Design a protein with these regions (language model features):
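Catalytic cores of phosphodiester-bond hydrolases, prominently lipid phosphodiesterases
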Residues: 2-257
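Cleavable C-terminal sorting propeptides in eukaryotic secreted/cell-surface proteins
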Residues: 260-287
Length: 287
């Protein structure tokens, strides 16, 4: 509406979470209130909106004061700043975009696939294969030079009015977001890393294929981070990958679906960067 960007999922008729500017203001306020935390935003620009359209809400929200801008746009895997360096710089927000990012036009909105590759998106397979899906055509040698995202948000295909759409598989959330067990986030992280504790089964060949990365995912993307087999299970997995202990209380829900429709994404280990919460803005629509 009047050129304003809204946060929508697939269609604003399905989910409209308000304007981008209002959301980014909440992020900016949170960063000011939490001076030792780091946030990364991954903008899913499914409508292929030109990157310059995002500068106004970023600036008006106040987030611009916190955004990290790299010195160059060919950062090697081990050259990203550490957590302490990010905090001391005061630039504690990293903004990535999957499509239409342009470093020359807006240097602080980072092109996701220049730095990161992803496992299969919107997975429906509980095996959660750790193969390269995006960007298409990326070879293994180049993938080893980049960070990677493990998509661990289990989906279910349903038909509405003759159209097939994917929705979160909420029935299995406790298992999907669990610390361990088949289909769990902990199991996928271990499989990608090459530290799976699952016994030899018919999946042995599959697991052997996954062990080639020999490092944890840099980001773990989940639906409903506040649901799991134990309180804070997704944070426990991320903590384990970072070789630390999670002592927080998270969100209090372990058995029921959150009433709100917020979809948050949680990071895993970032040896060369930091631990962070990733909010994935799925679709940006100008109404």
């Amino acid at each position: 509406m009047n050129g304003t960007i809204y946060l929508c999922h697939s269609s604003c008729d399905l989910l409209n979470a308000g304007t981008l500017e209002s959301y980014l203001k909440k992020v900016a306020d949170w960063l000011r209130d939490n001076p030792y935390d780091v946030v990364s935003l991954l903008i899913g620009n499914g409508d292929f909106i030109k990157v310059k359209n995002f500068t106004a809400p970023i600036q008006s929200s106040g987030l611009i004061d916190h955004i990290y801008t790299p010195k160059n746009h060919s950062i090697a895997l081990n050259d990203w700043p550490t957590l302490s360096e990010i905090i001391l710089s005061g630039k504690r927000a990293m903004v990535f975009m999957d499509y239409e990012a342009n470093h020359d036009e807006v240097p602080y909105i980072l092109d996701e696939f220049t730095y990161i590759w992803e496992t299969p998106f919107s997975p429906t397979d509980r095996n959660f294969p750790c193969d390269i899906q995006r960007p298409p055509g990326l070879n293994e040698a180049d993938a080893r030079k980049r960070m990677y995202i493990a998509n661990h948000n289990l989906n279910l295909e349903i038909s509405i009015a003759g159209a097939n759409i994917l929705v979160p598989n909420t029935v299995l959330l406790n298992e999907t977001n669990a610390v361990s067990g088949f289909g769990s986030m902990g199991a996928m992280a271990g499989n990608c890393t090459g530290t799976s504790s699952l016994p030899p089964t018919r999946y042995s060949i599959y697991l052997h294929r996954l062990e080639k990365w020999n490092r944890p995912p840099n980001l773990l993307l989940v639906d409903y981070y506040n649901i799991g087999n134990v309180n804070g299970s997704v944070f426990q997995v991320a903590a384990k990958l970072n070789n630390v202990t999670y002592n927080g209380k998270c969100c209090g829900r372990t058995t029921s679906l959150a009433s709100e429709s917020l979809i948050a994404r949680l990071s895993g280990k970032l040896e060369m960067i930091y631990s962070m919460i990733v909010i994935n803005i799925l679709v940006m629509t100008i109404l």
